Design a protein with these regions (language model features):
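Short alpha-helical linear motifs
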Residues: 66-74, 104-108
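Conserved mid-domain beta->alpha element of the FAD-binding
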Residues: 1-71
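Small/flexible residues
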Residues: 54-57, 82, 114
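C-terminal domain-closing interface element
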Residues: 70-89
Length: 115
């Protein structure tokens, strides 16, 4: 059994990546299981977990951080707003290059499974 999406790694909604993580999970799972025999399934499922765990953990942690930042109050909220107002959008978005630049090909290289 392989769990994907929120069943495997439920995330808070503050990064808006829940559906994306499910689609990435499905794509990686399909790739690692492609063409494998029954005797290879346990090893391929372990590879799926090795591939996905670091990224999904990072997404969940980033979502938690965003949630905290979105719910600041008082002086912290004012400071956050001042920093965000002064930050050009292209510079702000650089912090998410790791998120939006993900490529399945790069992820599969870590598994060392021919796809």
């Amino acid at each position: 059994i392989a769990l994907i999406g929120d069943a495997a790694h439920p995330a808070l909604p503050f990064l808006a990546q829940g559906g994306v993580m499910a689609m990435e999970d499905a794509a990686v799972l399909a790739a690692v299981l492609k063409g494998c025999g029954d005797d290879e399934i346990p090893a391929r499922l372990a590879a799926f977990e090795r591939i996905r765990h670091p990224r999904t953990t990072r997404v969940m942690e980033a979502s938690i951080r965003n949630g905290r930042a979105y719910h600041l109050d008082g002086g912290m909220r004012l400071a956050r707003n001042a920093v965000l107002s002064a930050t050009p959008p292209h510079l702000f978005m650089r912090q998410y290059d790791w998120l939006y630049g993900w490529k399945i090909e790069d992820a599969l290289k870590t598994a060392r499974i021919p796809v």
